[in-house]
Amino acid sequence: MSRPAQLDRRGFLALAPALGAAGLLAACSRTQVGTGTPKEDVGLLAKLREQGFVKVGFAGEAPYGFQDGGELSGEAPTLHRAIFKALGVPELRPALTDFGSLIPGLLAGRFDVVSAGMSITPERCGKVIFSQPEFVSPTALMVRQGNPKRLSDFASCAREGATVGVLTAAVEASYAKAAGVPDDAVKSLAKQQDGLDALLAGRIDAFALTGISLRWLARTNQGAAVEVGSPFVPEVGGVRQWSAGGAVFRPGARDLRDAFDRELAKITGDAGRYVGLVGRFGFTAKEAPPRSLRTADLCAGKGPA
């Protein structure tokens, strides 16, 4: 999981607090009278079908949404391509954007969907609307090959007296401590590669991060004598710590979002199809969101029932 202050996929950048008078007038001119809905969002799906493409914003963050040899790739674009094709929109046209500019760019109409694996948070739900979850990001442990201490979760780390590496200021430190790992056995590291290097050097016994990120780290360090364990969902105070991401739409594009959700459910509800689409990016059936995990609950700051 990423550091709270970092502007990456899971960070949050608030929009500018106020608009000038000219901006307000421009915004009014773009809305449907009596609804507050941007004009271009009325019948948006029909428009996309007619033009044959949808503009998507992405931030160039692997494995969620990035360019590979000039082609748009990653978890989100792959899912979204399949969904929009089913909706009669055969092409995704990418717009590479700084992560912090994705929501402002969406609201300004520079693209119609954010395809970046953006986490669903209450703060963002106050600005935009999300699809149902596309994935969850359970935690995992990277250990030395063979897993000599048989570590599987934070409780096993506490039991075995293991030293756990985490990213500086990341939430995994609090998860480990909540499971009983002593403060002096939790070691902070500046970046992901530092975690793998510390593990290989024997300075830590496990490196804790999301399973998705750890599998990608292992993939980009092929030949390293490490392995990534099965993902698990930590608990703090009896509350399971989920992190879920989805597609992002303007508030007026509910019809498009709802159509998107109907196709998304066909994929996330079929583990074989889900892994067949996004498995090459490090996603497994355990990253498929449970049926009980709903965007409305995540927007309210709650987990699944």
Task: Indicate where each model-derived feature is located.
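Periplasmic-binding protein-like
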Residues: 136-142, 222-261, 285-304
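Ligand-binding clefts/hinges and TM-proximal coupling segments of bilobed small-molecule sensing domains
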Residues: 171-186, 259-305
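Flexible hinge/capping segments at coil-to-helix
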Residues: 132, 145-163
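Extended ligand-binding regions for polar small-molecule ligands
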Residues: 29, 77-86, 147, 155, ...
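A ligand-binding cleft/hinge motif common to bilobed small-molecule-binding domains
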Residues: 117-126, 175-178, 205-241
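N-terminal secretory signal peptides and thylakoid transit peptides that target proteins
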Residues: 2-23
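Extracytoplasmic small-molecule ligand-binding "clamshell" domains
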Residues: 36-117, 126
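Short helices/loops that flank or line small-molecule/ion binding pockets
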Residues: 85-86, 93-96, 100-114, 127-129, ...
